[in-house]
Regions:
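Acyl-donor-binding surface of acyltransferase catalytic domains
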Residues: 31-89, 166, 173, 179-181, ...
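Short glycine-aromatic motifs
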Residues: 5, 12, 65-69, 130-131, ...
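Compact recognition or signaling/catalytic modules
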Residues: 122-212
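Conserved donor-binding loop and adjoining core beta-sheet/short helix segment
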Residues: 1-43, 136-160
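Active-site rim helix/loop that mediates acceptor-substrate recognition in acyltransferases
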Residues: 1-8, 110-138
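Alpha-helical elements of Rossmann-like donor-binding domains used by nucleotide-donor carbohydrate transfer enzymes
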Residues: 43, 100-104, 165, 169
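Short amphipathic alpha-helix that is part of the acyltransferase structural core
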Residues: 1, 83-117
Length: 212
């Protein structure tokens, strides 16, 4: 399902992210400008519901702040020293294995708030950018992730206790001077993990409110 970067009504302009509707039945509304914010929001909600969204979130205008907070998206940064004893075997994702990598991460991240679903049409871009890996040790899959330059875009472990090995293995490729990532405020387990790894919260990037 395609997104609407510009959704124009007589009440104002918004952008609609609908790509998660087929997977998570979620839609995201960002109000760009509003002459009548209540009416604009209602039109956006109505459209999102019409295409199948059951959970709808919004941001971009003070009007939506009266609704329950769903989550905030936090930025975390830090200088991380790779612990070599925790580095395992890295298998670069290829055209033949991109689907398997994508499916694994989607399954692991589906319960996480604001975690976007990886689609097959985005595989080539990931391959072109590089930095996507499986992490193995002794013939067993420990996890997978995607490190693009200094940004850790995705990471998931295949079993409890493997997170640190996956983390240090991914960072061993380029050893960025300062690592950056984004995490939902509701993902407290991940935040605690990243803090143990040496990262700190540096900014609140945006807030999403549950409007339906």
């Amino acid at each position: 399902m395609r997104d609407f970067p510009v959704f124009t009504t007589e009440y104002g302009v918004a952008s609609l992210v609908l790509r998660e509707v087929p997977y998570r039945q979620e839609a995201y509304i960002t109000i760009q400008s509003a002459l009548q914010p209540e009416e604009l929001l209602n039109e956006c909600i109505s459209f999102c519901r019409m295409v199948g969204a059951e959970k709808i979130f919004a941001r971009g205008h003070a009007y939506v702040e009266q609704y329950p907070l769903h989550c905030a998206i936090l930025e975390m940064r830090g200088c991380v020293e790779v612990e070599e004893e925790k580095v395992s075997n890295l298998w670069p994702v290829t055209k033949e294995t991109a689907g398997q990598w994508r499916q694994f991460l989607n399954e692991k991240l589906r319960p996480i708030d604001n975690a976007g679903t990886l689609e097959s049409k985005g595989e080539q871009e990931i391959l072109d950018l590089g930095g996507a890996y499986f992490v193995h040790r002794d013939g067993q899959l420990l996890g997978a992730g995607w490190l693009a330059g200094e940004e850790l875009k995705l990471i998931a472990s295949a079993k409890p206790g493997a997170g640190e090995q996956v983390f240090h293995s991914l960072l061993s490729v380029d050893s960025p001077e300062q690592l950056r990532l984004e995490v939902a405020s509701t993902n407290e387990r991940a935040i605690r993990f990243y803090e143990r790894m040496g990262l700190v919260k540096t900014a609140e990037l945006r807030r999403w409110y549950r409007v339906h």
